[in-house]
Amino acid sequence: VNRELALESYLSSGVPGTVYGLYMAHQKFGNLPWKKLIEPSILIAEKGFKITETLAKSLETNSLKLAKRSSTKEIFFKDGSTLKTGDLLVQKDLAKTLRLIAQKGPAGFYKGVTARKIQSDMRKNGGLISTRDLSNYKAKFRQPIKFNYKDLKIVTMPPPSSGGLILGLMFNMLEEITLDKNEPLSADNILKISEIMQIAYSLRSVYLAAVSYTHLRAH
């Protein structure tokens, strides 16, 4: 597997679901008007906010990745280096996109000018997402995965996200081993947990796919 292609290239991107998911959650559970909810984010994106120490460290850590793309370099760099603590981060384009989402709901993102810009950027950089993919996207309510670990009841995300199933698998395997409670960060504990994680993630690539198109078998 080409790690860079799988994790950092345009081929690693799926259709973004956050906008549609948040809109559906608002329609079902929200009380405030949709536009009013987005207003503060538009203001912050347009006027900017001061970079915190934590964000500055994160930008510095990821500076090589951010420098690869002119779009991210333009936003997160100043005078040849990433923004520092106290610098102002302004995101005018984000403010424009948020305004469209505030006015039109999901259509402000998945259709029209935003969708066309996403498709154009994808085509320039070897990505696959098209305006058709975006306009056809729909979020879905799904039943969460529930499982027990010792005296805890854990509720987490179902497929098509792999996280919940993998988490459940790892906890099931943890039930079969003994960890040193007095030394949680001991080398032996870390080795056992890392081996469990490796096994779980290797199984993910074999058995998991989108549930709308694939039947998942229980093992």
Give the role of each language-model region:
Residues 214-219:
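Conserved small/polar residues in nucleotide/adenosyl-binding loops
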Residues 1-104, 110-158:
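Noncatalytic scaffold domains of N-terminal-nucleophile
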Residues 145-147, 152-213:
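Internal alpha/beta scaffold segment
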